[in-house]
């Protein structure tokens, strides 16, 4: 007689955790940090169409790492929920905390009830309205539904330890946009392979996806930073991306958020 397969609940949870962590670590890193005018998103992403960073609602942004199809379905669900609540009540009733809690509940349910967890990690960022005091909050939601709020920076995906170490050394509250972009990109470049080639790693402008949430904007705070503006920001801040031009005057074009 063949005995049925048995695994303890603890072993099943450990296996799920290991699977999710490995899936997230295979991706490229994303840095989300606060600066003097709001929130900055910087993702290492060579794709021009498959975004890791996007807008959820008027004052709320979204960043994710892991399996694209999984976090894209979560992003679309968050947009739908935000639009529905804003339509039924008031646009100011849509908050980052409510969306972060909804994501945490959804991910926790999948992790506990399904055989395979989502291999994703999410950051929901929110800024206040222009008339409010400067304030930004970052909600980090893990694959198992664990949620933590941060006030300075969040690092997700890839090899996070060297990036976190670099940010702890270089990040300061109240950085301007140019300095914040430089700090984030230099931290991402610190995540290269160990050994002699570690210091030689550079990330070109074409491999970066950058966006901001600006509290001073009247309604929709989210906007993307174009490649040209990003190149000027990096060159003006002295960051080596191997594609620089000597110019430091930067004006971000007004572009509709996606």
Curated annotation (Swiss-Prot):
Pathway: Protein degradation; proteasomal Pup-dependent pathway
Gene Ontology MF term list: threonine-type endopeptidase activity
Location of this chain's protein in the cell: Cytoplasm
GO CC field: cytoplasm; proteasome core complex, alpha-subunit complex
Activity regulation description: The formation of the proteasomal ATPase ARC-20S proteasome complex, likely via the docking of the C-termini of ARC into the intersubunit pockets in the alpha-rings, may trigger opening of the gate for substrate entry. Interconversion between the open-gate and close-gate conformations leads to a dynamic regulation of the 20S proteasome proteolysis activity.
Keywords: Cytoplasm, Proteasome
Primary location class: cytoplasm
InterPro entries named in the record: Ntn_hydrolases_N, Proteasome_alpha-type, Proteasome_asu_bac, Proteasome_sua/b
SUPFAM superfamilies in the cross-refs: N-terminal nucleophile aminohydrolases (Ntn hydrolases)
Example of a GO biological process term: modification-dependent protein catabolic process
Similarity section: Belongs to the peptidase T1A family.
NCBIfam families recorded: 20S_bact_alpha
Subunit and interaction comment: The 20S proteasome core is composed of 14 alpha and 14 beta subunits that assemble into four stacked heptameric rings, resulting in a barrel-shaped structure. The two inner rings, each composed of seven catalytic beta subunits, are sandwiched by two outer rings, each composed of seven alpha subunits. The catalytic chamber with the active sites is on the inside of the barrel. Has a gated structure, the ends of the cylinder being occluded by the N-termini of the alpha-subunits. Is capped by the proteasome-associated ATPase, ARC.
Function of the protein: Component of the proteasome core, a large protease complex with broad specificity involved in protein degradation.
Name of this chain's protein: Proteasome subunit alpha
Organism: Nocardia farcinica (strain IFM 10152)
């Amino acid at each position: 007689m063949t005995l049925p397969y048995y695994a303890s609940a603890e072993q099943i949870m450990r296996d799920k955790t290991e699977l999710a962590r490995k899936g997230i670590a295979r991706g490229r890193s994303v840095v989300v940090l606060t600066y003097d005018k709001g929130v900055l998103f910087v993702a290492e992403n060579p794709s021009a169409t498959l975004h890791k960073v996007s807008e959820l609602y008027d004052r709320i942004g979204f960043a994710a790492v892991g399996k694209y199809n999984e976090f894209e379905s979560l992003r679309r669900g968050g947009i739908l929920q935000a639009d529905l609540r804003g339509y039924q009540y008031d646009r100011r009733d849509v908050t980052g905390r409510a969306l972060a809690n909804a994501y945490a509940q959804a991910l926790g349910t999948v992790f506990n009830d399904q055989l395979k967890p989502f291999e994703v990690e999410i950051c929901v960022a929110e800024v206040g309205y222009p008339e409010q005091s400067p304030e930004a909050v970052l909600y980090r939601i893990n694959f198992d539904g664990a949620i933590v709020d941060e006030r300075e920076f969040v690092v997700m995906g890839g090899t996070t330890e060297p990036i976190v170490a670099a940010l702890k050394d270089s990040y300061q509250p109240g950085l301007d946009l140019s300095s914040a972009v430089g700090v984030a990109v230099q931290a991402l470049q610190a995540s290269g392979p160990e050994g002699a080639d570690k210091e030689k790693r550079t990330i070109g402008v074409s491999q970066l996806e950058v966006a901001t949430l600006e509290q001073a904007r009247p309604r929709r705070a989210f906007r993307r930073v174009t490649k040209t503006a990003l190149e000027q920001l990096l060159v003006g801040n002295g960051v080596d991306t191997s594609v620089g031009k000597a110019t430091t005057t930067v004006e971000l074009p007004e572009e509709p958020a996606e």
